[in-house]
Structures are given as structure tokens and as C-alpha cells.
């Protein structure tokens, strides 16, 4: 239940040291150069503004040091004319937008099928490869229409917003650090991870409601309102709202697996992103661009290492925690009287009637009745999701490279 995108932007730097006094000759905030700087700052990645074990990722490519630019000049803007300057100013926005669009919109059908396969204990076809996933996507789209693959997308955005807002509020009114400085210690790390765990626990009822909207079959489900996720989440807490069966697990039973999954996903993705950024930084330092391609290459070196690191971090965390996510989703969905699509056929519906007593019982039952591969049901959807993400990133890189070369 982690947000798939960054919690913030390192470029703002609002949690650094004391407020710096403006130097003489520097224009106040709001000028053209400053606005250009905010636009071209590389998009951050999950955890990068929280776990600063080394230096922060340089906002500009290795081939264009910050000190080489004048007070009123944008770093990384070569002498390519106003066209190249304009493209550079909006390059970060465009590239980051493409990545956000892929993760939250284009990949949503993969998330829908992935979750339906995870909670479908009836399934004989585990959909471990992308080929069977694409086939079942086609079948569901043919019988139920395109809406069946995009259901619950609005609620996923709401859960992300609740998660980010909760984290910000807790960090403001408690000593738990939302970010870690360069000189961190074990106490700060413990408080920081505690903040992450509390955030996921508070957002847990809304995550359950969003999960139900995502896996509920389009055949029998009514058109939900955009705030139904919030209403159902509050109803789950106070014990009101849609009636559930006696097999519904209390929220206290869900706290540990929910917090464990959220914290582990954050830690794994943060470590992987740091390692990938360190590797890419060393690679870029050994291959400096030529003068003719400095503007183009410096722009690409500024933005794409961040996106590649974010991609690798999310992929590794999703793959490593996939079995735990399967258990988590089955516990959340139990007792909610949810009807899902038949992921074997694509044109029937199935009820969810599990009777797990808790996390340990769920793990033992899956292992006994479905085998070890039962924890990886729907894994082919992950392959499709990240393959699509790679394709969009590569296409975006080609488009920006072509545009910048044409105007330079």
C-alpha cells in the first residue's frame, strides 16, 4: 500500500538548514531563471529525500557542473538558442509526467489483474507469464468492456493522497523525522521507519476499500462514487456501512502485515535506488559527452538516472515482496463479500469465501493447498507492467533526444 510515486521533491529543500539569505545580484523568487530551475529539477524517487546516506543526487548532469553557470544562467542550457532552452525548461516536467502516467494510468489494468489473481484461491491457472495475462485481459475486455480493467483507479489516487497527507501531519506534530539528514543515527532511522509504519496503519482501512473496488467484478458492481473509498474506510473503522460476514478479520489482525509490507517495501526500494544511482553516477563520470552533444547529453544525464533508479527500486521491491503482498490482499479481502472475475475463463464470477484466522494461517493454507507458486499468482502482470514502463521511458528518451538535437 505504498505510494507508487515520490512523496516529495528534493529540489525544494525546505527541510534543510536555516533559511539562506539571498546573495546580492540574485533576483527574487518568481523570476524567469528561478522558475526555469524549478521546472528542470529532476523528479525525485521514493525515499531519495528520506534516506540520504551519501550525497544528494546532483540535479544536473555530471558534464555540466553547477558552478559553471552564471548567476542568471540555467545550468545545462547550452548555446542551442531559445528553442533548446525552452525544451530544457520543460524536459523534467515532461519526462516525469510520462513516468507518472505510466505508473498510475497505463499500468492500472495490470494492477487490477494482478490483485484479482492474488485473491483468487479457486484459480487453476496461476498466470505466472505475461502471455496468459494478456490473454485474460483480452477476454475480460471483450466480455465486460474497457471499464473492467480500469476500475478502482480513482480510489488508488485517494489512498496515495491520504498516505502522503497522514505522513506530513504526523511528522509535523511528533518528533518522528520525515527525512533523514546526512548524519543519521539508529534513533533517527527507528523513528523514521516508525513514521512510515504508522502512516500505513492509519491509511489501512482506506486501502482495504480501494482493494475491494479494484478486484470487484464489473458484472455485479454498481458505479461507485469517487469518495466511496473514504466512506467505506471510515465505515470499516467505526463498524458501520456495507454489511460484512463473520469471517471479516478485525483491523487489529491486519495491522502487523500491513505495516510490515509497507516498511519493507520502502526500505528495499530506498536501498536499491541508492545503489543504482551510485552505479549510474560512476558510469556517467567515465563517459563525458562531447561539446557538440553537451546540451542533449547533460539533460538526459540529469533526468533519466533518477527515473531508472526509481524503476529498478520499485521492480525489486515488488518482486521480493510479492508473496507477502498476496497474503496481505487475501487477509484484507476476507469477509467483505466480494465477487471477483474468474481469472481462468474471463467471463464468469467467483465469490471469496476464505476462512483464514490470521497471517500465519493464511501462509500455511496457501502453501498446503496451492503450493509455493500459489504465492506468485498473477506474477505475469508484474512483467507486463514493468515492460510497459520501460517502453514508455525509452520512447520518451528518444523523443526528447530527437527534439533537442533538432533545435541545437
From Swiss-Prot:
One Gene Ontology CC term in the entry: mitochondrial outer membrane
Family of the protein in this entry: Belongs to the mitochondrial carrier (TC 2.A.29) family.
Region (Disordered): 1-23, 52-80
InterPro entries cross-referenced by the UniProt entry: Mitochondrial_sb/sol_carrier (IPR018108), Mt_carrier_dom_sf (IPR023395), SLC25A46 (IPR039158)
One of the protein's GO biological processes: cristae formation
Subcellular localization, as worded in the UniProt entry: Mitochondrion outer membrane
Protein name per its UniProtKB record: Mitochondrial outer membrane protein SLC25A46
Organism of provenance: Gallus gallus (Chicken)
MF terms in GO: protein-containing complex binding
Keyword tags: Membrane, Mitochondrion, Mitochondrion outer membrane, Repeat, Transmembrane, Transmembrane helix, Transport
Record SUPFAM superfamilies: Mitochondrial carrier
Summary of the function given for this chain in its UniProt record: Transmembrane protein of the mitochondrial outer membrane that controls mitochondrial organization. May regulate the assembly of the MICOS (mitochondrial contact site and cristae organizing system) complex which is essential to the biogenesis and dynamics of mitochondrial cristae, the inwards folds of the inner mitochondrial membrane. Through its interaction with the EMC (endoplasmic reticulum membrane protein complex), could regulate mitochondrial lipid homeostasis and thereby mitochondrial fission.
Membrane topology: Multi-pass membrane protein
Solcar repeats: 86-177, 301-403
Main subcellular location: mitochondrion
Regions of compositional bias (Low complexity) in chain numbering: 66-76
Sequence intervals crossing the membrane: 93-113, 157-177, 189-209, 248-268, 304-324, 373-393
